């Protein structure tokens, strides 16, 4: 059972505070009113059971249908066969505009409340979106800040970046067969992951940051420098580091450096990784 708050929006559920003068000259302030909804299921479409979103339609008998179901039903109410999809249910729409629900990541620390139906928009940028530990066999999930602390205390492998003039430099050394190298940027409390994908044409190298796409995290670009024993140098500059909640085992389709097999120096791969924080506009 989930409790949600009905609050005023567009003048619907919650009354305005107003000052009213009484007969004796004193002002009386009306208290705001709110209500608690204990069952979110009543805000679901009775046909597809998905969350109702504006516009909401009703037939002549008052049966509800969401905008997605109406064309699928050929505008025929499944409950009474009356036409549906032409009459808006303004009462339900006003309720939807007034319902505030807690973030689904409240147990991780998020205190935000979101208007019903807009949860997914908030979750994409929520600072508390759960991130998965990239260490194989570890099932830990938590906010990106908690994940950093978890990794630092529990695993503590890989090197730590050193920074100069806002740029973090990491000497990344890994076996290609390991496929993944986890690096820490202490100043930002962030984990960056270097991944290798060995293919017939060479080794793909990509870098990602384990964090949500939240403004608080910031944006980063990265550069890779690879030098062979013979002195041949390859460089790659990515305009933006991809932020992920969980590391993928799929070869990247973009933002990668491809090192041909002819330039590899055995099973060990050594690179210089530079991470630069982009200035927010």
From Swiss-Prot:
Q: Name one Pfam family in it.
A: Sina_RING
Q: Which residues bind Zn(2+) 2?
A: 133, 138, 150, 155
Record: residues binding Zn(2+) 1: 103, 110, 122, 126
Which InterPro entries does the entry link to? Sina-like_RING, SINL_plant, Znf_RING, Znf_RING/FYVE/PHD, Znf_SIAH
Renumbered zinc finger spans (RING-type): 45-81
UniProt entry keywords in alphabetical sequence: Metal-binding, Transferase, Ubl conjugation pathway, Zinc, Zinc-finger
Task: Please write the reaction equations for the catalytic activity of this protein.
Answer: S-ubiquitinyl-[E2 ubiquitin-conjugating enzyme]-L-cysteine + [acceptor protein]-L-lysine = [E2 ubiquitin-conjugating enzyme]-L-cysteine + N(6)-ubiquitinyl-[acceptor protein]-L-lysine
Zinc finger (SIAH-type) in chain: 98-156
Q: What does this protein do?
A: E3 ubiquitin-protein ligase that mediates ubiquitination and subsequent proteasomal degradation of target proteins. E3 ubiquitin ligases accept ubiquitin from an E2 ubiquitin-conjugating enzyme in the form of a thioester and then directly transfers the ubiquitin to targeted substrates. It probably triggers the ubiquitin-mediated degradation of different substrates.
Q: In which pathway does it act?
A: Protein modification; protein ubiquitination
How does the entry describe the domains? Answer: The RING-type zinc finger domain is essential for ubiquitin ligase activity. The SBD domain (substrate-binding domain) mediates the homodimerization and the interaction with substrate proteins. It is related to the TRAF family.
Respond yes or no to whether keyword Zinc is given for this record. yes
Q: Which domain of life is it from?
A: Eukaryota
Q: What is this protein called?
A: Putative E3 ubiquitin-protein ligase SINA-like 6
Which terms does the record give in the GO molecular function aspect? Answer: transferase activity; zinc ion binding
What are the boundaries of the region SBD?
95-280
Q: Which family does it belong to?
A: Belongs to the SINA (Seven in absentia) family.
**EC number of this enzyme:** 2.3.2.27
Organism lineage: Eukaryota, Viridiplantae, Streptophyta, Embryophyta, Tracheophyta
Q: Which GO terms describe its biological process?
A: protein ubiquitination
* Chain positions covered by the region annotation Disordered: 1-26
């Amino acid at each position: 059972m989930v409790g949600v708050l009905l609050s005023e929006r567009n003048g619907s559920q919650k009354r305005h505070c107003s000052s009213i003068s009484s007969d004796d000259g004193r002002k009386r302030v009306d208290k705001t009113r709110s209500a608690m909804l204990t069952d979110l299921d009543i805000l679901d479409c009775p046909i597809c059971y998905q969350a109702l979103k504006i516009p909401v339609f009703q037939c002549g008998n008052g049966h509800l249908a969401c905008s997605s179901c109406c064309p699928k039903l050929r505008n025929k109410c499944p409950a009474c066969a009356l036409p549906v999809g032409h009459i808006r249910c303004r009462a339900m729409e006003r309720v939807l505009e007034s319902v505030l629900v807690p973030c689904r990541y409240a147990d991780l620390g998020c205190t935000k409340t979101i208007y019903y139906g807009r949860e997914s928009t908030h979750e994409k940028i929520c600072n508390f979106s759960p991130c998965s530990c990239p260490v194989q066999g570890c099932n830990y999930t938590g906010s990106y800040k908690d994940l950093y602390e978890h990794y630092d205390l529990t695993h503590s492998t890989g090197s730590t970046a050193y920074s100069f003039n806002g740029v973090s430099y990491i000497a990344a050394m890994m076996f290609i067969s390991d496929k993944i190298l986890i690096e820490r940027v202490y100043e930002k409390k962030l984990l960056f992951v270097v991944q290798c994908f060995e293919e017939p044409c060479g080794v793909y190298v990509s870098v990602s940051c384990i964090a949500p796409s939240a403004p608080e995290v910031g944006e980063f670009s990265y550069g890779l420098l690879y030098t062979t024993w013979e002195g041949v140098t390859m460089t790659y500059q990515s305009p933006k580091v991809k932020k992920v909640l969980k590391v993928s085992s799929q070869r990247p389709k973009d933002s990668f450096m491809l090192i041909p097999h002819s330039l590899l120096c055995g099973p060990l791969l050594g690179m210089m990784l530079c991470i630069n924080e982009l200035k927010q506009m």
